[in-house]
């Protein structure tokens, strides 16, 4: 029996230990879990009666919290209200929404019932009037309420006419005191505040935030005149909304008290005009704003607000002081609160502030003041010391307050979170103001703009939190003297996108000696004109930032006199963070050559416009333009897609240096053997450009034509490597000569069906004929003689080559590359370093081809490593006098059957 008792005792002990351990673990979890999580995300909130039990358990743990000893004793008051009066106040309080449009129980004017009370402090007793205060139910729906206390005029309390005793959690315990501490550093007007304890009808001390109410006495004690208008905003007036949309109508505004000369609202009327969307774009907006409001104090208010991450100054939380002796508003910081950090891209919070801080000078001043504040280690240490003092002052009294709604666990969690928010906002601001992103685009001007003196158009897109500034431009040393003489000038665009005298000139000053790139730094001298500000971000439907802003700014670098070659003018731009002074983040830096597409509109002009511009063409038929005779082409001519180009037999076109003829129209160019059509250079040693046809669906035709002395061209975004070029434009070319080209190719065909017959390619500086991406087609009965590089070069092309002769070319008689699959027969390849080269996954079939006196008759290899091995199949062909018959590299295969 005794053994059984021992065993049962051990089991009971184990059960007790497990139970105690479970309770301790549960208590630990409970202490670490916010009530909202317990209620909404765990089973506790779904068990009837469990939540109430949990709260009882939670509050039963209050005794575990003691709090640190306060550094000083809080002032204590006694407030006694007759039970009947207290009951009457309770019964007058709202229990239902004023209307279905409201989101909260709201204290409307008819519920603001005053009662007599006795107020005792420091052994002195006062007969006072009291009522509950605060718009929202958290101030008066529970046992502990916020109060307005009014003292008799003949017996003020420490000079106070009215005071507010506010539940401290509404002002986030110590936070509003820290905000006020910062306000004093900026000399901002604010109501005096204290932490106090109050015994209500003999209760234990309850913690309150005491704020002196807005009265003339309060202002005069702070050295301000009391004969002023002090404006407030709020709600509860309308059936349709809880908070008044005060920037919609003057009538929504109210006053705490008025100046003696009259109870009028003209200054608010003006304020609303300055708050209208887009008002800041008015050139006189800044002058109007600084006339009606103290912008220095407005900036200081913003700094204090942002230091707390505040987003609490919307329509219903505005307090404004209008001093008729100065004719100016002063912002009155009120209930700033504190929030988790959020990007400074957000607008400040109401229509007036949003519009005012859209003025770049005001926002820049605010950001610089913020940066100066958060970079001052002594300043921040002082803030943290005051925060810690306030924490110590409040903690023990908060825990001992028996009527507060929260448990001590919740209070401690909230206090610790507020400590974190204080520091995280500071660190976040430091990081945010370092973000100054800019994209730069340097535009080489079109020929038309060059003639107007423009050297560069400089476009900046600002999208950072902090504004940027265009601070320097480095230019070649030879142009520095022109800057000093005022010939080279920098202008800021007025917004119309083009340079003119209405733009604003910026002073420039050269600095120092040339750097290793022979560039001299030129400093800009006017910060206001070189500021690169960011406008509003893109917001989603909920008002959250969706996309950072893209705000464009344009500058013109011009020469007022001596022309400057834009190609020789190399420059380097420096952009700095206008807030921190450090280098801005250039996230994109590109150059745009506006000459490239400056003539694109000519590609689709109508026939009448074309003929007016080029009268040596003549109209022919319904949509044709024709050329006859001999003409000198001094500039590039672009034939639009709206016509057909006919070049008559016997026409000779002599092109000046670099001049071209580009057609977006089909070309009919049929000469006679006795009257060929010729295109050549005006001067033999000055190559002209190209004759090119681009993106034409209808076929062109060339017969009995001669092309010589041309080169290459880059027109409307297309590079033409051939003196004669057809890109994506079908053509038949017969009985034609292509010689003495100075570019990469005598003729270049791209994306076409190839149809070349009886064409002579000779003495071209590089390739005679270059075919790229041909659909199919034939090159036949043609000669390729003494070209500087390849006689013919094909890429990505499945064509037939027959009955041609390619001889004495500088590199290859015939080059086949990039997956081409030609069939070559009845052809002579003679006198070249390489007769036939097949490369890069190309596969050539040859029949009856003669290889004579070449260095290497047939070569096959991989040139580009991402291609496969090529192959060559040769039948019924002859090899004579070649130094080397075949050379196969990189796995290439060359097969020869029935060769002689």
Question: Locations of the language-model features?
Answer:
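Conserved oxyanion/phosphate-binding beta-strand-loop segments in alpha/beta enzyme cores
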Residues: 113-169, 703
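Middle-to-C-terminal accessory/interaction subdomains
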Residues: 138, 262-269, 273-314, 320-321, ...
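Internal "kinase-insert"/substrate-recognition segments embedded within catalytic cores
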Residues: 153, 188-191, 203-300
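A conserved helix-loop-beta module that forms one wall/lid of the active-site cleft
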Residues: 168-203
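A short glycine-rich, hydrophobically flanked beta-strand micro-motif that places a catalytic Asp/Glu
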Residues: 191-197, 314-321
């Amino acid at each position: 029996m005794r053994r059984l008792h021992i065993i049962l005792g051990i089991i009971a002990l184990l059960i007790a230990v497990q139970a105690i351990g479970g309770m301790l673990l549960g208590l630990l979890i409970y202490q670490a879990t916010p009530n909202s999580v317990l209620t909404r995300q765990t089973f506790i909130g779904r068990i009837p009666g469990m939540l109430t039990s949990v709260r009882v358990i939670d509050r039963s743990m209050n005794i575990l919290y003691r709090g640190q000893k306060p550094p000083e004793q809080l002032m204590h008051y006694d407030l006694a209200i007759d039970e009947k009066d207290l009951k009457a106040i309770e019964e007058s309080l709202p229990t239902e929404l004023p209307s279905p449009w409201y989101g909260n129980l709201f204290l409307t004017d008819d519920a603001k019932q005053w009662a007599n009370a006795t107020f005792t402090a420091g052994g002195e007793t006062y007969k006072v009037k009291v009522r509950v205060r605060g718009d929202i139910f958290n101030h008066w729906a529970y046992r502990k309420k916020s109060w307005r206390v009014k003292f008799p005029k003949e017996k003020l309390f420490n000079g106070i006419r009215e005071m507010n005793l506010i539940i401290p959690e509404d002002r986030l315990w110590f936070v509003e005191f820290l905000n006020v501490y910062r306000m004093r550093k900026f000399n901002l007007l604010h109501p005096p505040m204290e932490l106090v304890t109050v015994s209500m009808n003999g209760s234990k001390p309850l913690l309150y935030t005491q704020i002196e109410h807005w009265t003339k006495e309060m202002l005069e004690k702070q050295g301000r005149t009391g004969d002023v208008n002090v404006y407030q905003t709020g709600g509860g007036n309308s059936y349709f909304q809880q908070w008044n949309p005060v920037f919609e109508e003057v009538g929504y505004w109210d006053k705490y008290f008025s100046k003696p000369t009259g109870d009028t609202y003209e200054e608010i009327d003006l304020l609303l005009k300055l708050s209208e969307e887009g008002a800041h774009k008015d050139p006189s907006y800044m002058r109007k704003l600084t006339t009606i409001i103290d912008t220095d104090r407005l900036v200081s208010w913003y700094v204090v607000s942002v230091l707390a991450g505040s987003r609490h100054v919307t329509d219903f939380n505005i307090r404004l002081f209008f001093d008729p002796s100065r004719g100016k508003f002063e912002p009155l910081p009120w209930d700033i609160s504190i929030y988790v950090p959020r990007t400074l891209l957000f607008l400040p919070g109401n229509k007036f502030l949003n519009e005012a801080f859209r003025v770049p000078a005001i926002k820049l001043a605010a950001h610089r003041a913020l940066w100066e504040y958060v970079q001052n280690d002594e300043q921040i240490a002082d803030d943290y010391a005051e925060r810690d003092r306030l924490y110590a002052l409040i903690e023990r009294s908060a825990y001992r307050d028996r009527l507060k709604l929260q448990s001590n666990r919740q209070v401690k969690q909230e206090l610790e979170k507020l400590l974190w928010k204080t520091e995280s906002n500071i660190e976040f601001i430091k990081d945010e103001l370092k973000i100054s992103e800019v994209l730069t685009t340097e535009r080489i001007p079109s020929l038309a703009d060059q003639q107007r003196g423009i050297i560069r158009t400089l476009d900046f897109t600002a999208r950072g939190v902090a504004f940027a500034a265009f601070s320097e431009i480095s230019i070649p040393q030879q142009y520095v003297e022109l800057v000093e003489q005022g010939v080279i000038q920098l202008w800021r665009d007025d917004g119309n996108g083009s340079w003119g005298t209405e733009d604003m000139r910026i002073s420039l000053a050269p600095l120092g000696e040339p750097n290793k790139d022979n560039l001299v730094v030129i400093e800009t001298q006017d910060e206001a004109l070189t500021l690169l500000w960011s406008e509003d971000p893109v917001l989603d439907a909920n008002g959250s930032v969706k996309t950072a802003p893209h705000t464009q700014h344009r500058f013109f670098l011009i020469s007022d006199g001596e022309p400057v070659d834009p190609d020789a003018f190399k420059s380097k731009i420096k952009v700095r963070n206008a807030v921190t002074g450090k280098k801005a983040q250039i996230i994109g830096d590109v150059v745009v050559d506006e000459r490239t597409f400056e003539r694109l509109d000519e590609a689709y002009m109508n026939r009448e416009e074309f003929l007016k511009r080029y009268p040596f063409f003549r109209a022919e038929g319904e949509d044709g333009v024709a050329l006859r005779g001999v003409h000198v082409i001094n500039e590039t001519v672009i034939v639009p897609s709206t016509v057909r180009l006919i070049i008559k037999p016997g026409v000779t076109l002599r092109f000046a240096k670099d001049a071209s003829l580009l057609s977006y129209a089909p070309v009919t160019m049929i000469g006679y053997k006795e009257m060929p059509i010729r295109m050549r250079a005006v001067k033999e040693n000055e190559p002209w450009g190209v004759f090119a046809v681009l993106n034409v669906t209808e076929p062109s035709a060339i017969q009995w034509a001669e092309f010589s002395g041309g080169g290459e061209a880059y027109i409307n975004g297309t590079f033409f490597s051939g003196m004669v070029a057809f890109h994506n434009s079908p053509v038949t070319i017969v009985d034609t000569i292509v010689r003495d080209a100075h570019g990469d190719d005598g003729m270049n065909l791209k994306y076409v069906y190839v149809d070349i017959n009886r064409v002579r390619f000779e003495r071209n500086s590089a390739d005679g004929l270059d075919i790229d991406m041909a659909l199919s087609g034939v090159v036949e009965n043609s000669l390729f003689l003494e070209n500087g590089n390849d006689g013919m070069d094909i890429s990505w092309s499945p064509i037939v080559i027959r009955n041609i002769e390619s001889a004495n070319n500088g590199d290859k008689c015939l080059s086949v590359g990039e997956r081409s699959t030609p069939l070559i027969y009845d052809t002579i390849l003679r006198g070249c370093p390489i007769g036939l080269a097949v490369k890069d996954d190309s596969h050539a079939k040859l029949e009856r081809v003669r290889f004579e006196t070449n260095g290497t008759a047939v070569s096959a290899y991989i040139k580009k490593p991402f291609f496969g091995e090529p192959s060559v199949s040769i039948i019924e062909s002859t090899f004579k006098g070649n130094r080397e018959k075949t050379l196969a590299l990189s796995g290439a295969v060359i097969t020869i059957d029935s060769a002689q």
